[in-house]
Amino acid sequence: MFYDTDVWPQLDNESLWIYDKLILSRKLGYKCGPCGVPVPYAADYIVRPIINLEGQGKGTEKLWIEHDTWHLKFGYFWQEIFAGRHLSIDYHKGSQLRCTEGFREQKSFVHFTRWILVDEKPKLPLIVQDITTQYDDVNIEMIGGNVIELHLRKNKDFDDGAIEVIPVWEDRQNSKPENFFYVEDTDDERPRLGLYKRYE
């Protein structure tokens, strides 16, 4: 399966928390809370939907919050901000398949400019490690070594052996890079037209 919208209807009730980013964050010990729960101190926080099956960071914002959070949208939550590299790791039946690093536009949580294959095996919290052995395919998103999302499907963009991928967005202009091949890859979940791919 390639889409979270396909996975959700088949999940058992005990596993639904995997797609609940607030519960996941709480289980991992992050500073977080739903709309209405005050923040522990005044700072910038990441605010995003508790559940977002469409993915790609949609609805995510960085907001300065003094204390109260009643002004946030219902169904959203706040969480401490993590800095560092953005990694996407695929597992199949408990074994790591690949690890990729993503680079996005500085002011956007949606538009990634490229993804590259990296030779790394990030250490996972035990609760997340257990998930990788319970399902055939698991994709894990991390920032600065902190797990931020779980998906019970894989990242299909690198299945064909690509080592670098550049998304082509419908609202961005891309010129074809040298030594890359264009692959049309439109879908209903993301506003992208295709991918430029580079192979060894």
Regions found by a protein language model. Give the residues of each.
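Active-site nucleotide/adenylate-binding loops and adjacent lid/helix of ATP-dependent enzymes
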Residues: 2-126
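ATP-dependent carboxylate activation and anion-phosphoryl transfer catalytic cores
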Residues: 56, 105-111, 115-200
